[in-house]
Amino acid sequence: MKQTKKSRLAKWAAAGFWLAVWQAAAMAVGQEVFLVSPVQALSTLLELLPQAEFWQRIGFSAGRILLGFGLGAVSSVVLAVAAGRWAWVEALLAPVMQLVKATPVASFIILALVWVSGSSLSVLISFLMVLPVLYGAVRTGIGSADVQLLEMAKVFRLPLGRRLRAIWLPAVLPAFRQGCSVALGICWKSGVAAEVIGLPDSSIGDALYRAKITLSTGELFAWTFVIILLSAVFEKLFLALLDRAVAHVLGEEGV
């Protein structure tokens, strides 16, 4: 308990330190067009909160980015299971996954604009960024399954459902959870970056671009804070729901 309290105090102290550095830097620069103070950024955010357009932009971007994440998560699990079952599938997918991981996000965004509209761009980019991360995580989990337990399950001819609960899910889910934690952050960053280039109306990326061209640095910082907050909140909510689902599936609920 004391350790947890000390850890929280340390985090708050670190946050306070960097806010003080930010405030000092803003005062040293002395021009809000280049760097606003944290107080001014917060003030701008509070001005945005009552506006219907603010929430409309959040709903638009969040819906598409999370759709891309969901599609990427489902596809990665299906492909990873297929790769674990058939070696030729893994051989086919290996160069594709490596290519997706190595290609800059900006290149994908520009190329994707040829194929899809600006409003769908963030879905596709989020999907592409999530896919190799979760594919690798699930493959790692599958590879860590206990070989002896698998042999025993084969000998005793355990049904698929029992094998999933007793062997495969305990091996895969920790790696999948860790992969989701990484992938959620990536999909938010890449999704908003896609919106900044694709400029779909009523999106967060469009708001960032407008703030940049009008030199509204306060809005730029306010929207950046919103993106960080949304990413953190959705990550915590998703991981909490995933943990509850895992506990239920593995029969650990209430333990």
Label the model's feature ranges.
Residues 67-97, 110:
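Transmembrane-helix boundary motif in ABC transporter permease subunits
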Residues 179-229:
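Non-cytoplasmic
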Residues 98-133, 140:
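Generic hydrophobic transmembrane alpha-helix motif, especially the helices
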